[in-house]
């Protein structure tokens, strides 16, 4: 399977890419030129033939909603709205049928911790650029999927934590669990627009995982993700 991964300069994306590189043929991209040791194509994800050439021949795209904090807020939001739209449009034109959008559980953390928050709950993003970027990126993806242009699986990830480290929060997500979720999303029998909450098994874990997703009034199967047992849990 040939997979394009965006935002290669983001450490979380590179952590995933290093592991996925042994399973798939990866092409990485970012607006900043960089050396990765893997196939890399610099791209601004503009509305032109360059983005079509970038996605041409890919079987799937893993697109990150994480915004570079060194960019201005307007640049961060522009990337998640305009550039995400450009990427999905090119994917549709080039007949890429699968996109995995990496979002965040941060959109859900305004709910009280004693609530059993699932994927059916409405996101409540904060007013900061990082939270709004995830929210607006999801919005663009959802509208594309609703028009049946591309099948999109949205993974709301917990706080990325290196394997073997102490959990950073009650919604921590270890890298190996994140890899498992992404691999499942790449082969999941997507309905068009599917959302799944992903976190690891940690003490007092906050979010439910492994839930089925309700799309167009019908209950679909779960992603099949199960967090790995942790000795510290």
What are these regions (language model features)?
Residues 146, 157-162, 172-196, 201:
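Alpha-helical substrate-binding/gating segment
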Residues 46, 75-86, 94, 128, ...:
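Glycine-rich NAD(P)-binding loop of the Rossmann-fold in SDR/ketoreductase-type enzymes
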Residues 195-232:
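Conserved C-terminal active-site "lid" loop/helix of NAD(P)H-dependent oxidoreductases
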Residues 35, 42-81:
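NAD(P)H-binding glycine-rich loop region in Rossmannoid oxidoreductase-like domains
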Residues 1-22:
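N-terminal Rossmann NAD(P)H-binding glycine-rich loop of SDR-like oxidoreductase domains
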Residues 86-127:
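Conserved Rossmann-fold NAD(P)-dependent oxidoreductase catalytic core, especially the SDR/UDP-sugar
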Residues 107, 129, 147-169:
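Flexible, glycine-rich beta-alpha linker
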Residues 112-152:
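Catalytic helix-loop patch of NAD(P)-dependent Rossmann-fold dehydrogenases
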